[in-house]
């Protein structure tokens, strides 16, 4: 069993990241080499888009806010939660004073960021069971949402165990030692990473995250992921 744990936590991580990076580069090259569309979907008279307006449309979804305010709330919560989650993972690797404007220990939010993401994903998932979204959905949409839900669930369980259940066998130092050893290409698994009471949550979290990175491009999931809502 320890051999399986090691494969998931070390070689599979390198494989998943390698596949994801390679897939990203291939997709970028295809986009750059692809033919440019001679026409656009803009309505005449065409107005030149300003970069501030483009950023506003990209990050704040004004059209969704006007037509589907409830969906907009969950979209904002989901995307803000993802940013905070990304920062939290960075803080497991490095001490980043920039993010300590509000003093906190990783992760920011005391466990509620993960809870917010889980509720948002459930909203996106159940929304796909109703018309007209159901008719526009494909199985891949459900698979991605369920996979993301499980990744965040097991990751949040590790945070909740430490914060809410006072079950801190896997410490922040253990996580940091594990991540930094991977980045340095000198992988070393702390004892608690595979032998503590809730090490299975770390292993499942990493295993599912690996699957997500590996299959992200094989199932043409870039578009599906960006249109989860």
Regions from the PLM with identified roles:
Residues 2-229:
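Membrane-embedded alpha-helical bundles of multi-pass integral membrane proteins
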């Amino acid at each position: 069993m320890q051999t399986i744990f090691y494969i998931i936590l070390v070689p599979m991580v390198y494989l998943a990241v390698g596949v994801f990076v390679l897939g990203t580069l291939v997709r970028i090259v295809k986009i750059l080499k692809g033919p440019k569309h001679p026409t656009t979907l803009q309505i005449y008279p065409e107005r030149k888009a300003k970069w501030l307006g483009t950023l506003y449309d990209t990050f704040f979804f004004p059209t969704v806010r006007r037509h589907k305010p409830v969906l907009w709330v969950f979209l904002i919560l989901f995307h803000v939660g993802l940013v905070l989650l990304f920062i939290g993972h960075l803080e497991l690797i490095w001490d980043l004073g920039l993010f300590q404007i509000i003093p906190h220990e990783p992760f920011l939010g005391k466990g509620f960021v993960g809870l917010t993401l889980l509720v948002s994903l459930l909203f996106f998932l159940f929304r796909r069971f109703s018309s007209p979204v159901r008719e526009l959905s494909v199985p891949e949409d459900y698979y991605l949402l369920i996979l993301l839900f499980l990744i965040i669930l097991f990751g949040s369980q590790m945070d909740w165990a430490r914060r809410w259940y006072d079950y801190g066998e896997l410490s922040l130092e253990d996580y940091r030692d594990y991540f930094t050893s991977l980045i340095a290409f000198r992988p070393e698994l702390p004892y608690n990473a595979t032998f503590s009471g809730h090490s299975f949550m770390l292993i499942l979290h990493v295993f599912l995250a690996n699957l997500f990175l590996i299959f992200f491009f094989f199932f043409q999931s870039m578009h599906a992921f960006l249109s989860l809502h």
